């Protein structure tokens, strides 16, 4: 239960994240859940309904107690770090829009996250997926949608949220796609004919009329397709063909990067294609490729101990 004035602030903050910071719906939902968890803890901590004054005067003991509670509740370091980032983001918004001055929360450092290497699929698993994804959907246009979307992600390295934002306007350029990614960072990605041809075939039988600025990938009822819906299609594929547990829409983006590296792509070009702000993020794929080479070496090298 939240005070109505606080809920109004949260609503404004969410609009700010979407309209001015270009955050994805997925990120906004996650941030909102984290903030509400923090405010619920503040309710419990203060034994009364939280007001804007409670938020402004929250001290370091309260914030550290909340982080400790999340740790005791078995939240991962990554989830705890994201939660703290969400609350800090809300406080920054309050600085911009209210009389809140610099807050103690900005001095608290996030817990160190365990760095997990991106999990790519083997080239064989990608081929199996692309060949059989059309078997799921029950309706021809949905089957073709699934294949077009999966090929697009693997052929271009798009995030699922970026792929689901593709419109007819993106199709007008014959050579490249212009993508606005995380942090409003723009990048240009070459169109591969196979991806564009599949999308064209899909649009020819799509039973819904779309404007040039509307996302082309639609759900059964004609609304914009959402990531969880598409991932459910991939779960069916994964279970039936015994594909790796980490197979998701995002794993095809990882596979795009890893396979390009294995076939000789340079890191700087890959950084541009993936839309990474930092080269160090892209370098994580080199570790994945090295592990792949080690596995091949161990299995295939003729001289063994």
UniProtKB/Swiss-Prot annotation:
PANTHER family: PHAGE INTEGRASE-RELATED, TYROSINE RECOMBINASE XERD. Pfam families: Phage_int_SAM_1, Phage_integrase. It is found in: Cytoplasm. It comes from the Bacteria. Coiled coil: none annotated. Its main location: cytoplasm. Residues 4-95 form the Core-binding (CB) domain. Forms a cyclic heterotetrameric complex composed of two molecules of XerC and two molecules of XerD. This is Tyrosine recombinase XerC. It comes from Rickettsia africae (strain ESF-5). One of its GO terms (cellular component) is cytoplasm. One of its GO terms (biological process) is cell division. SUPFAM superfamilies: DNA breaking-rejoining enzymes. GO terms for molecular function: DNA binding; tyrosine-based site-specific recombinase activity. Site-specific tyrosine recombinase, which acts by catalyzing the cutting and rejoining of the recombining DNA molecules. The XerC-XerD complex is essential to convert dimers of the bacterial chromosome into monomers to permit their segregation at cell division. It also contributes to the segregational stability of plasmids. CDD domains: INT_XerDC_C. The active site is at 159, 182, 250, 253, 276, 285 (o-(3'-phospho-dna)-tyrosine intermediate). The keyword Cytoplasm applies. Belongs to the 'phage' integrase family. XerC subfamily. Residues 116-298 form the Tyr recombinase domain. InterPro entries: CB, DNA_brk_join_enz, Integrase-like_cat_sf, Integrase_catalytic, Integrase_recombinase_N, Integrase_SAM-like_N, Tyrosine_recombinase_XerC/XerD, Tyrosine_recombinase_XerCD. Keywords: Cell cycle, Cell division, Chromosome partition, Cytoplasm, DNA integration, DNA recombination, DNA-binding.
């Amino acid at each position: 239960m939240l005070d109505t004035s606080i809920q109004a602030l949260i609503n404004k903050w969410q609009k700010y994240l979407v309209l001015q910071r270009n955050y994805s719906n997925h990120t906004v939902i996650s941030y909102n859940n984290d903030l509400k968890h923090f405010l619920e803890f503040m309710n419990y901590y203060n034994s009364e309904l939280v007001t804007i004054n409670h938020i402004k005067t929250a001290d370091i003991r309260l914030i550290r107690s909340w982080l400790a509670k999340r740790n005791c509740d078995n939240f991962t370091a990554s989830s705890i770090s994201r939660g703290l980032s969400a609350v800090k983001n809300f406080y920054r918004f309050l600085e911009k829009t209210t009389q809140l001055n610099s807050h103690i929360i900005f001095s608290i450092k996030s817990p160190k996250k365990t760095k997990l290497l991106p999990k790519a699929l083997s080239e064989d698993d990608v081929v199996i997926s692309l060949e059989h994804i059309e078997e799921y959907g029950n309706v021809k246009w949905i089957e073709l949608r699934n294949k077009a979307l999966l090929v697009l992600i693997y052929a271009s390295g798009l995030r699922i949220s970026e792929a689901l934002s593709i419109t007819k306007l993106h199709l007008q350029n014959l050579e490249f796609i212009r993508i606005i990614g995380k942090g409003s960072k723009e990048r240009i990605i070459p169109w591969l004919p196979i991806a564009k041809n599949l999308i064209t075939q899909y649009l020819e039988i799509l039973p819904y009329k779309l404007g040039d600025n509307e996302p082309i990938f639609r759900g059964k009822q004609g609304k914009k397709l959402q990531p969880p819906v598409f991932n459910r299609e991939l779960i069916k594929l994964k279970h039936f063909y015994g594909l790796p547990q980490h197979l998701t829409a995002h794993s095809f983006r990882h596979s795009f990067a890893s396979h390009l590296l294995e076939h000789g792509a340079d890191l700087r070009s890959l950084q541009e294609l993936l839309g990474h702000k930092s080269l160090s993020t892209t370098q994580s794929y080199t570790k994945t490729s090295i592990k792949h080479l080690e596995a091949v070496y161990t299995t295939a090298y003729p001289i063994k101990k």
